[in-house]
Regions:
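Positively charged n-region of N-terminal signal peptides that target proteins for export
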Residues: 1-4, 180
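Sec-dependent N-terminal signal peptides
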Residues: 4-13
Length: 469
C-alpha cells in the first residue's frame, strides 16, 4: 500500500511538474502581437520573437467551466491562439440598450486570466449581428437596439449609416479599451463577424469600414485591428473581399471558407487542402504585404445548414489536419482555424492535431527565412513548399485519401511506400546540411540522407520534409 501511495504521489508530482514546464514564459505573456517590420507577411511579439497563431475558433462558449475546459485543452496540445465572440450570451455586456452588465465584464476578465495562464492570445470579435428588428436578442439579431424595444434604430442599415450608430459602436469599443486595451493576452480586435451578411447595401458596408477601421486602431494602438467577411464560396463575394482586405487600416487579411457541397464555387467541394490553399491564393493574388489567415474553415452541410456529417466518422481529425497545414504551407501567417471546436474537435478528441502542426514548425523562424510558397507536386502527392533563406519546408499530401474517399465513402487511407520528391530545382545550388522528415500521424521525426532528392518513408495521408542548407 505504501508503495502504491508513493507511486501515486510521484505520478502526481511529475504531472504537476510537466504542466508547470509547459507554462508560457514571462516574455511571451507580457508581449503584444504585432505585424513584423522585418517581414510584414508574418506576426511577431513585441519582444521580437516570431509568433505563429496555432489554435481554433472558440466563439460561443456556454459557461465559465467551458472557458477552462477549452483553453486548457488548447494549451495542453500546443495551441497559442483562440477566437472569441463578444456578443454571445456568456459575454454580451449590453442585453438592454444603454445598460452595461458588469457581470459580463467580470467573465471576460476571467477569460483573459485563463488566456494569460495558458499562453493563449485571444482575438476578440466585437460584433456579429446581422439584423436590428423587433423581438429578442440572438446571435444575429440586436433586438434591444430596435425602436420597439426602446432603442434608437429602425434597422441595421440605420445603425450602419447614421452618426448615432457610429457613436454607439465606438462607445462599445471604448468600454473594452478601458478594461483590456493594455492586456497582452489580446491578439487583436475584429470589428465584425462576416460583416457582408449585415442587412445593409454593400456600398454602406464599404464606407463604414473606411471610416471605422482607422478609428478603432486609434483606440487600440497596442493591438491588431482587422475585419472578417462571410465564406468565400461565390463569385459575387470577390469584389468585397478585395476591397476590405486591401484597406491599409485592416492589418490582417482574413478569409473564411468551408467544404460546402451547396456552394457556387466548385473549389468548395474539392479536397480540404485544395479548398484551403486556394483561399490563401486569392488573398495572395491581391499583392498584399500583410499577414493572411484562413480565419474560419471546416465542413458544413449544403449552404451552411449545419456541421457536415463527415465529422461523425473523422476520428483522426483529417479535416482539422488539412485546415491547419494547407494555409501555412501556402503562404499564410499561420495555420487555418477550424470553426467546429465543439461539433468536431472536442467531440472527436482531435485537439492533438494542433500539437502536431506545432511540432512540424517548431524552431522555424518565418521572419528570418523570408519564405516564398511554391508547389512541387509529383505523382500521387500535392506538395506545398515554403522556400526560405536557410530552410525548405514541404508538406506532402496524398491525392487519393480525400474527405470524399476516406470519410464519405469510408475507404481507409492507404499506407504509401516508395515515393520520392526532388527539391533540387528549388535549392538554387545550395548545399544540403540536414534533412529531416516528420510524420504528423505518428508524431515521429526521422533523419534522411543529405540530398535534395528526398526518398520519403512509408506514411499515411501526409508527411512534412524539412531541408536545412
Amino acid at each position: 500500500m505504501k508503495r502504491l501511495i508513493l507511486l501515486t504521489c510521484l505520478l502526481a508530482f511529475v504531472s504537476v511538474t510537466e504542466a508547470w514546464a509547459k507554462r508560457p514564459g514571462r516574455s511571451f505573456r507580457r508581449s503584444f502581437v504585432q505585424v513584423s517590420a522585418r517581414d510584414p507577411r508574418y506576426f511577431c511579439l513585441s519582444d521580437g520573437q516570431p509568433y505563429i497563431p496555432v489554435g481554433c475558433n472558440i466563439a460561443a462558449m456556454g459557461s465559465v467551466a467551458d472557458m477552462e475546459h477549452y483553453l486548457g485543452k488548447m494549451h495542453r496540445n500546443g495551441a497559442n491562439f483562440g477566437r472569441v465572440w463578444l456578443n454571445t450570451n456568456l459575454f454580451e455586456i449590453e442585453t438592454r440598450y444603454g445598460e452595461v452588465d458588469t457581470a459580463k465584464l467580470v467573465r471576460i476578465d476571467r477569460l483573459l486570466e485563463l488566456a494569460d495562464r495558458y499562453g493563449i492570445k485571444i482575438k476578440f470579435c466585437i460584433e456579429s449581428f446581422r439584423h436590428i428588428r423587433p423581438g429578442v436578442n440572438k446571435w444575429d439579431t440586436k433586438a434591444s437596439y430596435h425602436t420597439s424595444n426602446g432603442g434608437p434604430f429602425a434597422d441595421a442599415d440605420d445603425y450602419i449609416t447614421s452618426q448615432r450608430g457610429e457613436e454607439e459602436f465606438l462607445r462599445r469599443v471604448r468600454i473594452f479599451r478601458e478594461r483590456y486595451g493594455d492586456h497582452p493576452a489580446v491578439f487583436g480586435w475584429e470589428l465584425w463577424n462576416e460583416m457582408n451578411a449585415v442587412e445593409t447595401p454593400e456600398e454602406h458596408l464599404r464606407a463604414w469600414n473606411v471610416r471605422m477601421l482607422p478609428r478603432v486602431k486609434e483606440i487600440f494602438p497596442k493591438n491588431l485591428v482587422m475585419q472578417s467577411l462571410g465564406s468565400l464560396d461565390r463569385e459575387s463575394s470577390f469584389p468585397i473581399y478585395e476591397f476590405i482586405n486591401r484597406l491599409p487600416p485592416n492589418e490582417v487579411a482574413q478569409v473564411h471558407r468551408y467544404i460546402d457541397e451547396g456552394a457556387e464555387l466548385a473549389v468548395c467541394g474539392a479536397p480540404v487542402d485544395s479548398m484551403a490553399s486556394d483561399a490563401i491564393a486569392v488573398l495572395r493574388g491581391y499583392g498584399l504585404r500583410k499577414p493572411m489567415l484562413l480565419a474560419e474553415s471546416g465542413a458544413v452541410k449544403p449552404v451552411h445548414t449545419g456541421p457536415h456529417p463527415i465529422y461523425k466518422v473523422d476520428t483522426m481529425g483529417s479535416v482539422l489536419h488539412d485546415v491547419l497545414f494547407a494555409p501555412f504551407f501556402s503562404g499564410a501567417a499561420g495555420p487555418g482555424h477550424l470553426w467546429h471546436w465543439d461539433h468536431h474537435i472536442d467531440k472527436q478528441h482531435t485537439w492533438f492535431q494542433m500539437g502536431r502542426f506545432a511540432r512540424a514548425v517548431e524552431g522555424v523562424d518565418p521572419l528570418r527565412e523570408g519564405f516564398e510558397p511554391v508547389r512541387r507536386d509529383t505523382a500521387g502527392l500535392r506538395v506545398y513548399v515554403l522556400r526560405g533563406e536557410h530552410t525548405l519546408l514541404a508538406w506532402c499530401r496524398d491525392t487519393v485519401s480525400t474527405w470524399r474517399h476516406e470519410l464519405s465513402e469510408r475507404i481507409p487511407a492507404q499506407r504509401l511506400s516508395g515515393l520520392q520528391v526532388d527539391f533540387t530545382p528549388l535549392l538554387g545550388g545550395r548545399r544540403v546540411k540536414k534533412v529531416r522528415i516528420y510524420d504528423p500521424w505518428r508524431d515521429e521525426w526521422v533523419r534522411a540522407s543529405r540530398r535534395a532528392d528526398v526518398s520519403l518513408p512509408d506514411f499515411t495521408r501526409s508527411v512534412v520534409v524539412r531541408i536545412e542548407y
